[in-house]
């Protein structure tokens, strides 16, 4: 983790890409980025050992065409337990409220069907994931981004207490884990990922930054032309 290679474009599509969740399954490396603008959840496979290029394998889910969609699939991840694959994702229907949905499949590549407990949550506070599910000290954790007042205000942690083909339950474990008293996190953040690497825990987060001066200059220019 000391030396880093030069950044390269590993995937290019004619729609918005973000939240590049990269993982390994059956000795192959895959990626599920956010592709909600396309109206689908897409699975890509790495085509090089350097992970510098990916190819589309298939669409795991496509948005329902009989419902009004305000915001497409966002921040999707898969978790495997007891031979079942659980896919968690977020949608916004006719109202600006995050709806957390859960799907299940016997196979990694699907088909995925709605879990009996889905939708899990309809909430702007904890209804959108902030990273993949985490296993820590015997607990299964889900991190969520708080969008109550604005996009990515902070991150909460919930413990998933029940997960089976027929049940899902969770409870909030800790709220606002990003320390906003530290200048770096002053404006909040919306992502939290953890990995155990060579016996040590490595945490990746982000932080929001507002360029108020730039916004002020733009407003000034607009007013000066009126």
Locate each region found by the language model.
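Carbohydrate-active catalytic/glycan-binding domains of CAZyme proteins
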Residues: 1-226
